[in-house]
Swiss-Prot record:
Keyword entries, A-Z: Cell inner membrane, Cell membrane, Ion transport, Membrane, Potassium, Potassium transport, Symport, Transmembrane, Transmembrane helix, Transport
Subcellular location: Cell inner membrane
Secretion signal span: none
Pfam family, any one: K_trans_C
Disulphide-bridged cysteine pairs: none
Protein name: Probable potassium transport system protein Kup
Keyword tRNA-binding found: no
Main subcellular location of this protein, as a coarse class: membrane
Membrane spanning residue stretches: 23-43, 63-83, 114-134, 150-170, 182-202, 217-237, 260-280, 298-318, 350-370, 379-399, 407-427, 432-452
Top-rank lineage group of the source organism: Bacteria
Membrane topology: Multi-pass membrane protein
This protein's GO CC annotations: plasma membrane
Recorded name of the encoding gene: kup
UniProt source species: Cupriavidus pinatubonensis (strain JMP 134 / LMG 1197)
Keyword Ion transport: yes
């Protein structure tokens, strides 16, 4: 097939396939919101007076050249061509990538621990992104009012806060209704970006010289240290690139690639080159290149459209924070939290009240503290560059250990991408004192909390195993001399089907009865995002009406007792009458001690997190009137 015929076939597929078109438009509305709103502040920050770069046509050409080649190398080549191939059963993102590479490492090895900690730290840095993106995006959009009417400058922060508070308040109701508008609105946004850029570009076509990397390299050589500092601002055009990989599970790789190459990238390039062209004809426009390239009669409509686009970009990272936390809960790094489903049709649309309110408080605090988008720009890059470096490293491990690529090729690609990522990372490190400390502090705090929970759970399991009684011999002895049997079914939720659940021991001790049918139900999280219903359940009959029922779940799924029992009835013929079934749960009270483990204060922190996590009955969606909670104390 020739190149022309291949292109024609691809275009024909896109035009004739309505489902692909819908996915592409959906991806444009969700995946590209962050990177699509970068033109609001990226070039403005590159020409910040603090960088000390003398304004000149060569500086404009050099910076625009760096913007173009950064976008081409990092987004188009690294993410779209290579990283998006590293999917975990169709899912992307640093946690999915971590789960994928951990399959190739020996369990409990030092290498596995390094890979796990890298993945978790990369995920934690996303929380910094989830705080800064809404703040800088909405703030930079509303700042357009200052250009339209300088007298409105004192209202910028109040308007920004009203928009952001409203955005977080509507999360509890879900966004399925307004979410249908996200795609069309963002299509209008990108087309507008492209047209604005084209309008300015034709007035100074010499900006097209910036396609030549010579100008970018010359700029770096001529300005050395100042140019290196500017790289931290150039990186702002790449914020949101990770979303192409993270949201791959929602839309698929093909629609995201279509959206990027057909609409998003061309429009972004046109806009950045248009801003550069405007600066060649109007050097004073460096104050706010985006809004000063807009014809004056269109300024207010542009502020409105930009605000809509930034709200959509903010929604994407908020939803991403909910999804990331849900995955971390299933992987055992975060305490159970109450999860609400906001759409009956879309399983991915969830709402976590605790995360929502934490984000709201932090976002409001950031807007009030930093006041201007240019102040936030210094804080923005460090969170994203950290995640990018980790993603590149883990992707290289996948290339070598999973795909079995030639070591020389992996080294060449891995080092090339890492060199670019580390250059941006180092440039952003120079801004730690100016605001970069904030996402680092936020990400490090989240990492510390997640690792404390993970380590505490390991200690708790170890103590339970030390004191545990082997289940099958115990049941055999119990059935040989059975206590009084009562009608109904008892379901004992347990994390370890090898040992007798503490809840069963307490029930026998205090009630001295055994139900006519006993089921030990265990939920097991696997290293894949979803588990097919055909492979979800396994059952072992211990005789005497006693069963071990294991239910496998992916790390993007939330266990649901109702669905498991329905599935057991359909697939295994195990009939459950909910009102005749009692669910026994052990409620552990963690007691910090001087036993080997964590430091006392970390054990106390873990005990507090354990106490304040969602009740198992709430998390597993069990009717409250069918639950029997039996308390037990465990020293760690």
């Amino acid at each position: 097939m020739t190149t022309q015929s291949a292109t024609t076939a691809t275009s024909h597929y896109f035009v004739e396939n309505p489902s692909t078109r819908a996915l592409v438009i959906g991806a444009i509305g969700v995946v590209f919101g962050d990177i699509g709103t970068s033109p609001l502040y990226s070039l403005k920050e590159c020409f910040s007076k603090e960088h000390g770069i003398p304004f000149s046509p060569d500086a404009v050409l050099g910076i625009i050249s760096l913007l173009f080649w950064a976008m081409t190398i990092v987004v188009s080549i690294k993410y779209v061509v290579f990283v998006m191939r590293a999917d975990n059963n169709g899912e992307g993102g640093v946690l999915a990538l971590m789960a994928l590479v951990l399959r190739t490492a020996a369990p409990r090895s030092r290498w596995a621990k390094v890979l796990m900690m890298l993945g978790i730290f990369g995920a934690c840095m996303f929380y910094g992104d989830a705080v800064i993106t809404p703040a800088i995006s909405v703030l930079s959009a509303v700042e357009g009012l200052e250009i339209a009417t300088p007298q409105l400058s004192r209202f910028v922060i109040p308007i920004t806060l009203v928009i952001l508070v409203a955005l977080f308040l509507i999360q509890r109701n879900g966004t399925s209704v307004v979410g249908k508008l996200f795609g069309p609105v963002m299509v209008v946004w990108f087309v507008t970006l492209g047209l604005l850029g084209l309008y300015n570009l034709v007035q100074a076509p010499e900006i097209l010289k910036a396609f030549n990397p010579y100008y970018g390299i010359s700029f770096l050589i001529a300005h050395s240290l100042q140019a290196f500092i500017v790289l931290g601002s150039v990186f702002l055009v790449l914020t949101g690139a990770e979303a192409l990989y993270v949201d791959m599970g929602h839309f698929g790789a093909r629609p995201i690639r279509y959206g990027w190459f057909v609409l998003v990238m061309p429009c972004l390039i046109l806009n950045y080159f248009g801003q550069g062209a405007m600066l060649l004809t109007n050097p004073a426009g460096a104050e706010n290149p985006f809004y000063l390239m807009v014809p004056e009669p269109l300024l207010i409509p542009m502020v409105v459209l930009a605000t809509c686009a930034t709200v959509i970009a903010s929604q994407a990272v908020i939803s991403g924070a909910f999804s990331l936390t849900s995955q971390a809960i299933q992987l055992g790094f975060v305490p159970r939290m109450r999860v609400r489903y906001t759409s009956a049709a879309e399983i991915g649309q969830i709402y976590l009240p605790v995360i929502n309110w934490i984000l709201l408080v932090l976002v409001v605090a950031v807007v009030i503290s930093f006041k201007k988008s240019e102040n936030l720009a210094a804080a923005y890059g460090i969170a994203v560059t950290t995640t990018m470096v980790i993603t590149t490293f883990l992707a290289a491990v996948v290339m070598r250990n999973v795909w079995k690529w030639n070591p020389a090729l992996v080294t060449l690609l891995g080092l090339s991408f890492l060199l670019v990522d580390l250059a941006f990372f180092a440039a952003n490190l120079l801004k730690v004192a100016e605001g970069g400390w904030f996402p680092l502090l936020l990400g490090s705090t989240a990492f510390f909390l997640l690792m404390t929970w993970y380590s505490g759970r390991k200690l708790l399991r170890a103590r339970s195993l030390e004191d545990g009684i082997p289940l099958e011999p115990f049941i055999a002895g119990l059935l040989a001399h059975p206590p009084h049997r009562v009608e109904g079914t008892a379901v004992f939720l347990t994390g370890n089907t090898e040992s007798v659940p503490v809840s069963l021991l307490h029930n026998l001790k205090h009630n001295r009865v055994l139900h006519e049918r006993v089921v030990f139900l265990s939920f097991v999280t696997r290293d894949i995002p979803y588990v097919d219903d055909e492979q979800r359940l396994s059952c072992k009959d211990l005789g005497g009406g006693v069963f071990i029922l294991k239910s496998d779940y992916g790390f993007k799924e939330t266990p649901d007792v109702h669905k498991v029992l329905d599935l057991a009835q359909r697939k295994l013929g195990m009939h459950f009458e909910l009102m005749e079934t009692s669910f026994f749960i052990a409620r552990e009270s963690v007691i910090p001690s001087k036993l080997p483990g964590m430091s006392m204060w970390r054990e106390s922190l873990f005990a507090w997190m354990h106490q304040n996590g969602a009740k198992p009955s709430d998390f597993f969606q069990i009717p409250a009137n069918r639950v029997v909670e039996l308390g037990t104390k465990v020293e760690i």
